[in-house]
């Protein structure tokens, strides 16, 4: 029997696995998709928020500030791309200045460090490409940008290294109470566990309702984005927000840790995991973004994408044991600032286990830390050494991002190996550049096929059913028969 079963391996599930892996617990993670961080965690604004937006006294307020500080430490320890660039919330008219004052007061109450109000002159001195009608801004120096999928993957990798089991493509389809805990039905069979952690993202309501009386409603909300080429990456140097509204933090403009410019999102209620991009949504995003940064060149867009966030009708994170379901712990409604809060949310789980007397001693042989080879960032001497040790580092496969065959093979052989083209991209960056895999994609597919010992026809772009190749050319006629 397991001590803890975690349902979902986005950033909340991964952070929970990482936290619990420090203790002598039998823990397993069950992820419905074929990879870690394959839903909301891979498609969001990639920001670790400072913590001035949540209302004081809410879980969001406390966990945002605590989580952002913990995330900074974890990223340094696990070699995750991270940059503390700070954020600006703009007032674009005098009527918006009172809102900045309210956010400032929130920030002071929430313990956000270094927060201050700026004049128009101070704001434009920091960001000359902003709209000239800016009348002021709220500056939060502790805000940061991160690679969200790498953040989740790094925590999951270290958890697996320290004994946590990870089951991919393994959705939980039924939950039943037992005398000793819970029984989960999965494609791998029945799994018994003492505790369940519900970290299922937009599916958290459905998972909760399998085990306990209905308590909350997840309202999936889609946000569409532009990802612009690195030629636009220095258009701004801070995360640029407009004054938020009832739909969220509004359309933002932000640099990324990879050197691009990210613009979005809108906020549209959808059914399920509907990540379609729309002409109307993208038009709204580009028009709204130009209110902040008029000179953005959207002709430099290299990709559009959408993510779905788990808005919830409670207005705050849902954290704790479900009523009438002892041992079933919800971590639900993790909309923004869910990414920022994830490490602190995970610590709430250990507090619950400790309160029950079920948190054992910490491991004395814990193996923390992680490093990644990023060939393009190496010195000439380091590159020469790597190539001498492994000639695969001397073969550049992705020319846009200077990603080598050695890095791709690492992605296919690490503790949580990639199994898809997008899985490789998230681990090492191959296909993330201007041509979006147009050049390197076939070679990446070939390396996946050879390394994993599968047919090229079985190589997926991302989720199940996204096979890149339909058939062998000479068999096309027979295939259609």
PLM feature spans:
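Glycine-rich FAD pyrophosphate-binding loop
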Residues: 22-42
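C-terminal catalytic lobe of FAD-dependent flavoproteins
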Residues: 248, 257-258, 273-396, 403-416, ...
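Helical element adjacent to the flavin cofactor pocket in flavoenzyme catalytic cores
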Residues: 138-195
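Iron-sulfur (Fe-S) cluster-binding segments and ferredoxin-like electron-carrier domains
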Residues: 404-415, 438-456
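Dinucleotide-binding Rossmann-like beta1-alpha1 core, especially the glycine-rich loop
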Residues: 46-126, 250-251
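N-terminal Rossmann-like FAD-binding beta1-loop-alpha1 element of flavoenzymes
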Residues: 2-28
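Short beta-strand to alpha-helix junction loop
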Residues: 62-65, 90-99, 138-157, 276-280, ...
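Flavin-dependent oxidoreductases
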Residues: 15, 175-180, 184-264, 268-278, ...
């Amino acid at each position: 029997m397991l001590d803890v079963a975690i349902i979902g391996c986005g950033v909340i599930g991964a952070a929970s696995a990482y936290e619990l892996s420090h203790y002598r617990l039998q823990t397993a993670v069950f992820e419905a998709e074929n990879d870690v961080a394959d839903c909301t965690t891979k498609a969001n604004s990639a920001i670790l928020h400072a913590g001035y937006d949540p209302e004081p006294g809410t879980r969001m307020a406390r966990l945002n500030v605590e989580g952002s500080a913990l995330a900074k430490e974890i990223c340094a320890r696990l070699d995750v791309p991270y940059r503390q660039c700070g954020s600006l919330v703009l007032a674009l008219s005098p009527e918006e200045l009172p809102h900045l004052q309210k956010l400032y007061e929130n920030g002071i109450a929430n313990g956000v460090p270094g927060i201050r109000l700026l004049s128009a002159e101070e704001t434009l001195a920091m960001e000359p490409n902003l709209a000239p009608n800016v009348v002021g801004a709220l500056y939060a120096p502790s805000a940061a940008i991160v690679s969200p999928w790498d953040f989740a993957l790094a925590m999951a990798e270290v958890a697996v290294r320290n004994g946590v089991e990870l089951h991919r493509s393994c959705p939980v389809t039924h939950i039943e109470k037992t005398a000793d805990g819970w029984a989960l039905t999965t494609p791998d069979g029945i799994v018994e566990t003492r505790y369940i952690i519900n970290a299922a993202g937009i599916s958290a309501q459905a998972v909760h309702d399998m085990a306990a009386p209905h308590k909350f409603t997840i309202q999936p909300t889609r946000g569409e984005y532009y990802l612009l080429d690195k030629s636009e990456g220095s258009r701004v140097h801070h995360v640029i927000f407009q004054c938020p509204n009832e739909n969220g933090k509004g359309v933002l403009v932000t640099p990324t840790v990879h050197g691009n410019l990210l613009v979005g999102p809108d906020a549209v209620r959808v059914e399920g995991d509907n990540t379609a991009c729309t002409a109307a949504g993208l038009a709204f995003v580009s028009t709204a973004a130009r209110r902040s940064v008029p000179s953005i060149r959207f002709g430099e867009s290299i990709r559009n994408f959408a993510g779905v966030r788990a808005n919830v009708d409670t207005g705050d994170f849902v954290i704790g044991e479900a009523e009438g379901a002892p041992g079933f712990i919800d971590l639900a409604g993790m909309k923004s600032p869910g990414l920022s809060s994830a490490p602190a949310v995970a610590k709430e789980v250990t507090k619950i286990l400790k309160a029950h007397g079920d948190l054992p001693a910490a491991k004395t042989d814990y193996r923390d830390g992680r490093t990644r080879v990023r060939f393009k960032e190496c010195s000439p001497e380091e590159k020469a050494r790597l190539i001498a040790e492994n000639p695969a580092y001397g073969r550049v496969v992705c020319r846009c991002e200077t990603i080598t065959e050695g890095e791709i093979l690492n992605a296919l052989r690490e503790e949580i190996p990639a199994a898809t083209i997008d899985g490789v991209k998230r681990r090492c960056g191959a296909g993330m550049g201007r041509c979006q895999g147009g050049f390197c994609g076939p070679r990446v597919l070939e390396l996946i096929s050879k390394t994993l010992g599968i047919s090229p026809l079985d190589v997926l772009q991302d989720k199940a059913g996204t096979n890149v190749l339909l058939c062998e050319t000479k068999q096309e006629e027979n295939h259609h028969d």
